[in-house]
From Swiss-Prot:
Subunit structure: Homodimer.
Keyword Glycosyltransferase: yes
Protein known as: Anthranilate phosphoribosyltransferase
GO cellular component: cytosol
Molecular functions (GO terms): anthranilate phosphoribosyltransferase activity; magnesium ion binding
Binding positions (5-phospho-alpha-D-ribose 1-diphosphate): 82, 85-86, 90, 92-95, 110-118, 122
Reaction equations catalysed: N-(5-phospho-beta-D-ribosyl)anthranilate + diphosphate = 5-phospho-alpha-D-ribose 1-diphosphate + anthranilate
Length: 349
């Protein structure tokens, strides 16, 4: 299919149908095309601008080629992740938020790889904490059932795209795979909290997510204190643009820390630390409710906002503000800290 459509994409800016995009991904993972053709296809799509149908078709094929995890949630199974590629580097916010929210009953399938834009990614952090990130499908299901959380290490499950990943690294520029990774989780997620590096793409990814079976979700991009695009997650230093998904409807609006019952923080208080050891200490401080400095409080607030969003999307609370109150309680009574211990235990069974 790639050989049939490549000229039209380049010469005519032609958009692909869902089926054509699906077949193109089949071609990409087949290994039958020279690297230069694959590079040309990915670059041509990037220059044209990837459409909802194209991202949908590519993702469906990518998920079909992945190692399957046959987990059928009774209510909501949420994926929490971001694209990376943002400009403002924070600590492992989604990782900590997932630990807290799973302690509150949210079932979470966290799908990811090692660091993309951060200095120390979610997979790196979980591994350093003692979590086994290389789980088989059976162990993923067991971990979700036992402690509401499992990490799905992308390279194990998306083996078919290995050759394409090598080409991506050689290109050293964004491709459609920066968007496919966070939305191609092999579990049957029906809820989603996903950070995107470009605020202009939120509605596009929200529509793709609905095409993939997501019933409720928040596709987000956080801004800095000056209103500049900054981070692929909810922000507590500025406003956050959100595409809310609610059973077939999409609503795009801006939210602020005040919607969570919190105040704005200073950028310097949430910026990523320099070393892995500092990242891990931040996680421990949050789970132990350390609030000594302004940095401690700002980092805690950021995690509370993200945890609150997960709890809200999975219907464990009725509002974002209630989600913050519940998340704070889970930390203060030790539930979140015990949850990390459970995640470590069941991931290593």
């Amino acid at each position: 299919m790639i050989s049939e459509v490549l000229d039209d994409i380049i010469d005519k800016n032609r958009n692909l149908t869902v089926d054509e995009a699906y077949e193109c991904m089949d071609d990409l993972v087949s290994g039958n095309y020279p690297n230069v053709v694959v590079s040309s296809f990915l670059t041509a799509l990037r220059m044209k601008g990837e459409t909802i149908d194209e991202i949908t078709g590519l993702t469906r094929s990518m998920k079909n080629h992945a190692v399957q995890i046959d987990y059928k949630p009774e209510d909501y199974l949420i994926e929490t992740c971001g694209t990376g590629g943002d400009t403002f580097k924070t600590f492992n916010v989604s990782t900590v938020a997932s630990i807290i929210a799973s302690a509150g009953g949210a079932k979470i399938s966290k799908h990811g790889n090692r660091s993309v834009s951060s200095k120390f990614g979610g997979a790196d952090a979980l591994e350093a904490l003692g979590v086994n990130i290389e789980l088989s499908p059976e162990k993923v299901i067991n971990s979700i059932d036992k402690c509401n959380f499992a990490f799905i290490f992308a390279p194990i499950y998306h083996v078919a795209t290995k050759n394409v990943m090598m080409i991506r690294k050689q290109l050293k520029t964004r491709t459609v795979f920066n968007l496919l990774g966070p939305i191609s989780c092999p579990t049957n997620v029906n809820a989603r909290l996903t950070g995107i590096y470009d605020p202009e793409l939120l509605e596009t990814i929200a529509k793709v997510a609905m095409n993939l079976g997501v019933e409720c979700g928040m596709i987000v991009h956080g801004f800095d204190e000056n209103g500049n695009p900054a981070m692929d997650e909810i922000s507590n230093i500025g406003k956050t643009k959100v595409a809310f998904i609610d059973n077939g409807d999409i609503t795009v609006k801006y939210i602020t820390p005040e919607d969570f019952g919190l105040s704005f923080s200073k950028p310097e208080d949430i910026v990523a630390p320099e070393t892995p050891q500092e990242h891990i200490q931040i996680i421990y401080n949050i789970l132990n409710n350390v609030t000594t400095t302004s940095q401690d409080r700002a980092r805690l607030d950021l995690c509370l906002m993200n945890s609150a969003s997960i709890l809200y999307l999975t219907k464990k609370v009725d509002s974002l503000e209630e989600g913050v109150i519940y998340s704070r309680k889970l930390i203060e009574d030790g539930s979140a800290k015990k949850q990390l211990e459970k995640i470590i235990k069941y991931s290593n069974e």
